[in-house]
């Protein structure tokens, strides 16, 4: 499983400009250098045609150049005074094995209420796995079915965006409870430092219908392109078995490239949601535009920014 924009790792949603952004910056530097050389050459030519008295008079009359005003620096999130949490609990009974891992980043550990929430989730999942494993040992312990008695679970949270008020997190988990293969999935939440409470990413928007109306067409177009690329084809994708899933079936994550507000939205279709298990998951990044901000709840609009 690819760790969770957006799964368990901090997602870099990328940029719509891609490599062109760097190219534009390079062209700007070349133009600036050329402009500077032309100004220098012009100054030398003027100096050569002027007398020393004229040069001194012009220099004395020239007003001092005002220093260009610098834009204010964006606010910074609170400093982190905590350590990343990495918890494991493994056991073995003969050839039967049980493995469990759960972790969250230092930014989450620094918020007591959030750390308590994640700790409770970890303890609940561990207790469930232990009970399931013990039951499997009793039922299949004397059989040759190793897959029937092996259990594996991992869930890792990571930072998607860390803004002064909001900490956006994603998670990815993998679970094996017997059979041919395990299963993976993703999810996320946003922690509101002012309210000291969790907010579901969907909770920032006015309604599921509004999200579908605005994000749905962009998601389906990007998904079709991603499926064609993954399957190595150029023609249309057969959607008879796996039609484009609605936004309601996806993981929604809020990200920030500019660090001043949520300016991009990550959409993840877990395995089986938009394609076969072999296809894996699909991730799409939607830059925040004016029509997206229009469907954000009034109390959260200030937390969003247009993508640049």
Language-model region placement:
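Bacterial N-terminal signal peptides that target proteins for export
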Residues: 18-39
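Extended hydrophobic/Leu-rich segments
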Residues: 14, 33, 37, 85-87, ...
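C-terminal motif of bacterial Sec signal peptides marking the signal peptidase cleavage site
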Residues: 46-48
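Compositionally biased intrinsically disordered regions enriched in Thr/Gly
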Residues: 50-308
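Cationic, low-complexity basic patches in intrinsically disordered or flexible, solvent-exposed regions
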Residues: 10-11, 21
């Amino acid at each position: 499983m690819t760790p969770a924009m957006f799964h368990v790792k901090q997602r870099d949603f990328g940029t719509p400009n891609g490599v062109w952004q760097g190219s534009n910056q390079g062209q700007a530097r070349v133009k600036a250098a050329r402009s500077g050389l032309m100004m220098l050459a012009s100054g030398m030519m003027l100096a050569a045609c002027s007398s020393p008295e004229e040069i001194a008079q012009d220099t004395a009359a020239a007003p001092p150049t005002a220093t260009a005003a610098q834009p204010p620096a964006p606010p910074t999130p609170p400093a982190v005074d905590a350590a990343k949490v990495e918890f494991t609990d493994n056991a073995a009974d003969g050839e039967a094995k049980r493995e469990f891992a759960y972790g969250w980043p230092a930014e989450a550990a620094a918020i007591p209420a959030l750390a308590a929430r994640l700790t409770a989730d970890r303890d609940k999942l561990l207790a469930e796995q232990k009970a399931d494993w013990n039951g499997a040992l009793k039922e299949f312990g004397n059989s040759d079915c190793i897959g029937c008695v092996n259990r594996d679970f991992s869930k890792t949270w990571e930072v998607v965006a860390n803004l002064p008020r909001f900490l956006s997190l994603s998670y990815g988990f993998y679970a094996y409870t017997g059979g041919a293969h395990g299963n993976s999935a993703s999810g996320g939440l946003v922690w509101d430092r002012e309210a000291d409470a969790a907010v579901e990413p969907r909770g920032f928007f006015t309604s599921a219908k509004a999200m579908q109306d605005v994000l749905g067409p962009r998601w389906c177009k990007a998904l079709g392109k991603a499926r064609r690329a993954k399957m190595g084809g150029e023609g249309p994708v057969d959607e008879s078995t796996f039609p484009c899933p609605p936004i309601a079936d996806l993981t929604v994550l809020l990200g920030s490239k500019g660090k001043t507000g949520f300016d991009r939205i990550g959409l993840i279709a877990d395995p089986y949601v938009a394609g076969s298990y072999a296809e894996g998951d699909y991730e799409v990044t939607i830059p925040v535009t004016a029509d997206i901000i229009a469907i954000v709840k009034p109390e959260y609009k200030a937390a969003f920014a247009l993508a640049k």
